[in-house]
Amino acid sequence: MEQEVRKKQMKKQQTLVLIKPDGLVKALTGNIITELSDTRLIIAGAKIVQVTRELAEEHYQHLREEKFFDELIKYIMGEFHVKRVLALVYHGDDAIKKVRGVVGSTNPEKAEHTTIRGKYGRITSEGVFENVVHASENEKEAEREIKLWFRPEELATTIYPTESKEVKKLEYFWKK
């Protein structure tokens, strides 16, 4: 009975996870995915992305006024490591909370040592957080980020409403 009530309180969510260039160059992809799999969430989408300046700036638009913005853009674009990111969408009960718990604090020095960022992240001598992964902070951010990084047909499950439009071929677009 208690388990049924708890299950009803859980909310199906999706969240974006990026394994950043420093995570890829350090060959941490397998370790990170293994740790994320402990959440028992479903991978709804996965792809390797070469991050453009436009994508990076749109992703980090909320940090545009920060003094570290330019370094952050260079970092996610792979100018310090490799020029690619592994983008993943996880789906399931309380996905955001579960993933954020495994990932840890944005600042690797403040992250619990058992979390991904606590184990593998660092702060460079220039003050750049090489925190290995990104994870959406809340539902609104998750939706915005997933729609930014993935087209509907790239996801194995429909998580947001879409509509089809006739272009050169049948394509799907996120509903506004």
Model segments located where?
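Non-catalytic terminal and connector segments of soluble metabolic enzymes
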Residues: 2-176
